[in-house]
């Protein structure tokens, strides 16, 4: 069976080389190692440079230069470094160990193993005939891998012939920004702790995943009872796994968003891996709460691992990036609406709290899929969410009809999250799964658009709930505690969401009264 590569403490270097021609496996190269980095120059480039130098010397000695040779000589003599500077820039993270990801990855290369591209100089020369140009946008491809391309956008103001010089100057400056480029690709370093390697996300083999103890959350949600029992999980049913999974997801996301200062941008079921064998015994990670599981006081790995950082972006990288289509910033992703997934369509730019919103969607989907339709608990959850959206329940409507109505309502609510809709007071029975209130909190987070760090810091460190506590930090099970996820020190009540839970009278059936508005979320407990 395929065994996962151990990326712990694995150093990452970067291949940085320049080329006028695409680099192929068969291309002869000159290789030099400098400071544990490998510099590759294709032999063709060296031969061309030597030929150019020889031609220049011959031309200078003979003094028989035509116009083309004069132009070439002037360019080579005046811009001795420009020939290399205008070549393609390739920054490739390289592991010291040999790994293989998929079928296209070469030995020792990871993710960004494709050669970069630049616009043809001749094409730039053709643009010089335009007399006036206010702004010219030029995209430089700085990386390409399994999950798309990453561009660096250059904006130059120009008029007439100066356009050519400015664009060439911008390309030369790219070669001097190696440190900045490494910051862009620094997301690849996260694979050492946050990336679970498989043979390919699109073709994960169920037997291999079970053999090594990991399954994707998407697989876990789509299993039937027979498949789930074959996993030999210590849990008797999947509903028991909800709290441990969410707890571990929050810790992993905390490590990504806060500690490493990244936004994942693609948090979905297929990119979350769960170790079902350690989920029941794993305690909250002490210290930093790293998603790798290496806390200051514990050697236990976090049972939930985030994967596929192809869309991740470092928050403080001072380079503007474009998506695959060259659009500024990143557009939000589209998730399809079926039994296991929501359909979320929005054209707004992704912000640093996008991962928080995706986490709320995951909780919503886990709730509806871990509890099968037709059961009493599932029906109660669906009815509650429908009431939350102000939808009256038809007495003759069955679980499937209510579920379909809920999908439409929830999808519309997300799509119109900037609306000024005022929700009404809801009274419902307390026998519903407590996790249902959490999705309301996350929806409220996204409506108020708080900073991602505020939410995660509150989830992890609010009151006594820290990474040293075994209780899931997003659940409050002590009647003396308050749940203040935004800012515990804030004097503005409208910016604080309270969630309290009284479990002292387990035999009683209390009634919950929830008042939900766009600016506040209060939950009071009234025993009948």
Curated annotation (Swiss-Prot):
Q: Which SUPFAM superfamilies match?
A: Protein kinase-like (PK-like) (SSF56112)
* UniProt GO molecular function: ATP binding; protein kinase activity; protein serine kinase activity; protein serine/threonine kinase activity
Task: Show which residues constitute the signal peptide.
Answer: none
Q: Which PROSITE patterns match?
A: PROTEIN_KINASE_DOM
Per UniProt, which keywords does this protein have?
ATP-binding, Coiled coil, Kinase, Nucleotide-binding, Serine/threonine-protein kinase, Transferase
Q: Does the keyword Kinase apply?
A: yes
Pfam families xref list: Pkinase (PF00069)
Q: Which reaction does it catalyse?
A: L-seryl-[protein] + ATP = O-phospho-L-seryl-[protein] + ADP + H(+); L-threonyl-[protein] + ATP = O-phospho-L-threonyl-[protein] + ADP + H(+)
Q: Which residues form the Protein kinase domain?
A: 136-466
Record bears the keyword ATP-binding: yes
**InterPro entries for this protein:** Kinase-like_dom_sf (IPR011009), Prot_kinase_dom (IPR000719)
One GO CC term, this protein: cytoplasm
Reported EC number(s) for this entry are 2.7.11.1
Q: Where is the composition biased (Low complexity)?
A: 49-77
What residues bind ATP, as annotated? 142-150, 166
Tell me the active site: 266 (proton acceptor)
Region (Disordered) spans which residues?
Answer: 49-84
Gene Ontology biological-process annotations: signal transduction
Q: Which family does it belong to?
A: Belongs to the protein kinase superfamily. Ser/Thr protein kinase family.
Name of the molecule in the record: Probable serine/threonine-protein kinase DDB_G0282417
- What organism, scientifically named, is this protein from? Dictyostelium discoideum (Social amoeba)
Q: What is the lineage of its organism?
A: Eukaryota, Amoebozoa, Evosea, Eumycetozoa, Dictyostelia
């Amino acid at each position: 069976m395929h065994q996962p590569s151990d990326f712990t403490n694995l150093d990452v270097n970067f291949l940085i080389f320049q080329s006028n021609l695409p680099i192929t496996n068969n291309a002869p190269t000159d290789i030099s190692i400098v400071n544990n980095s490998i510099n590759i120059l294709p032999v063709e480039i060296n031969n061309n440079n030597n030929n150019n130098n020889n031609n220049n010397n011959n031309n200078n000695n003979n003094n028989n230069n035509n116009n083309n040779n004069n132009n070439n000589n002037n360019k080579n003599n005046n811009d001795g470094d420009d020939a290399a500077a205008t070549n393609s820039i390739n920054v490739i993270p390289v592991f010291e160990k040999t790994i293989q990801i998929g079928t296209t990855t070469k030995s020792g290369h990871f993710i960004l193993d494709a050669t970069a591209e630049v616009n043809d100089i001749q094409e730039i020369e053709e643009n010089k005939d335009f007399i006036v140009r206010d702004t010219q946008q030029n995209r430089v491809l700085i990386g390409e891998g399994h999950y798309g391309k990453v561009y660096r956008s250059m904006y130059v103001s120009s008029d007439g012939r100066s356009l050519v010089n400015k664009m060439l100057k911008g390309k030369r400056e790219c070669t001097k920004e190696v440190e900045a480029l490494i910051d862009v690709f620094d997301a690849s370093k996260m694979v050492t702790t946050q990336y679970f390697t498989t043979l390919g996300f699109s073709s994960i083999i169920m037997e291999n995943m079970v053999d090594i103890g990991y399954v994707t959350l998407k697989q876990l949600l789509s299993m039937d009872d027979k498949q789930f029992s074959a996993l030999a999980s210590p849990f008797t049913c999947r509903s028991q796994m909800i709290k441990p999974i969410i707890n571990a997801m929050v810790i992993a996301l905390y490590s990504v968003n806060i500690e490493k200062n990244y936004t994942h941008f693609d948090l979905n079921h297929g990119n979350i891996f769960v170790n079902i064998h350690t989920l029941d015994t794993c305690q909250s990670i002490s210290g930093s709460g790293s998603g790798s599981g290496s806390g200051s006081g514990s050697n236990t790995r976090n049972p939930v691992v985030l994967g596929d950082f192809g869309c991740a972006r470092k928050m403080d990288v001072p380079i503007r990036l474009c998506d695959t289509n060259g659009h500024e910033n990143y557009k939000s992703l589209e998730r399809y609406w079926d039994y296991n997934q929501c359909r979320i369509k929005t054209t707004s730019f992704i912000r640093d709290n996008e991962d928080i919103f995706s986490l709320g969607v995951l909780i919503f989907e886990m709730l509806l899929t871990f509890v099968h339709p037709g059961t009493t608990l599932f029906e109660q959850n669906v009815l509650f969410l429908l009431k939350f959206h102000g939808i009256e329940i038809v007495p003759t409507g069955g679980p499937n009809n209510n579920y379909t109505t809920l999908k439409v309502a929830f999808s519309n609510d997300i799509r119109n999250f900037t609306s000024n809709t005022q929700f009404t007071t809801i009274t419902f029975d307390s026998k519903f799964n407590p996790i249902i209130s959490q999705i309301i909190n996350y929806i409220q987070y996204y409506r108020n658009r708080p900073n991602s760090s505020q939410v995660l810091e509150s989830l992890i460190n609010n009151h006594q709930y820290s990474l040293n506590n075994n209780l899931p930090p997003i659940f409050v099970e002590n009647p003396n505690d308050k749940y203040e996820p935004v800012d515990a020190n804030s004097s503005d009540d409208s910016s604080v969401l309270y969630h309290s839970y009284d479990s002292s009278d387990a035999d009683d059936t209390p009634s919950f009264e929830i008042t939900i508005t766009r600016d506040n979320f209060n939950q009071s407990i009234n025993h009948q």
